[in-house]
Amino acid sequence: GDVDVLKSLSADQKAAIKSSWAAFAADITGNGSNVLVQFFKDYPGDQSYFKKFDGKKPDELKGDAQLATHASQVFGSLNNMIDSMDDPDKMVGLLCKNASDHIPRGVRQQQYKELFSTLMNYMQSLPGANVAGDTKAAWDKALNAMANIIDAEQKRL
C-alpha cells in the first residue's frame, strides 16, 4: 500500500526532498502565502473551502494577515511530515490526523492533490530548491502516497 511507498523512499530520495524543502522552509510563511494565492488562482473552486477567504480575489489576499497565519499552519504541518520521513509510522499518524481534521470542511483527496500540484509548480521555480529530475520524481512519489493515505483515512472514518 501507500505506507509501503513511503517506507520505500530511498535515503537519497528523502535527502533530495528535505534539501529542496529547506529552500521553501527558509521563509515558510512567505512562500506558503505565495502558494496559497497561486492555489486559489489555479483552482478557484477550492478557495470556497476557506471561509475566511471565500469571495475575495486571490491578489487581494497578498499580505493578508489571516492568509499568512493559515499558510504558516498548512505548510508548518507539511514541514512536520517532511521532518518525520525517517519515521513513516509517525508521518502516517500526522497524515491521518490532518485527514480527519479536514473532513468537516469537505476537503478531500482531490483538494490535497491540487494543492500539491501548485506547490510543486512553485517549488520548481523557487531559487535553491532544485526541484527537477530525480528530486521531482521523489516529491511526486511521496506526495502521491501522502494523498492516497489521506484518502484511505477519510474513507475509513
Curated annotation (Swiss-Prot):
Entry keywords, A to Z: Acetylation, Heme, Iron, Metal-binding, Muscle protein, Oxygen transport, Transport
Stated name of the protein: Globin
Organism from which the protein derives: Nerita albicilla (Ox-palate nerite)
Statement: the UniProt record of this protein carries the keyword Transport: yes
Domain Globin: 8-155
Subunit annotation: Monomer.
GO MF annotation list: heme binding; metal ion binding; oxygen binding; oxygen carrier activity
Highest taxon, organism lineage: Eukaryota
Pfam families, per the entry: Globin
Biological classification of the source: Eukaryota, Metazoa, Spiralia, Lophotrochozoa, Mollusca
Keyword Transport: yes
InterPro entries the record matches: Erythrocruorin, Globin, Globin-like_sf, Globin/Proto, Mb-like_M
In-chain residues carrying the UniProt-annotated modification N-acetylglycine: 1
Binding positions (heme b): 70, 102
GO CC annotation: extracellular region; hemoglobin complex
Annotated CDD domains: Mb-like
Protein family per UniProt: Belongs to the globin family.
SUPFAM superfamilies reported in the protein's UniProt record: Globin-like
Chain ranges passing through the membrane: none
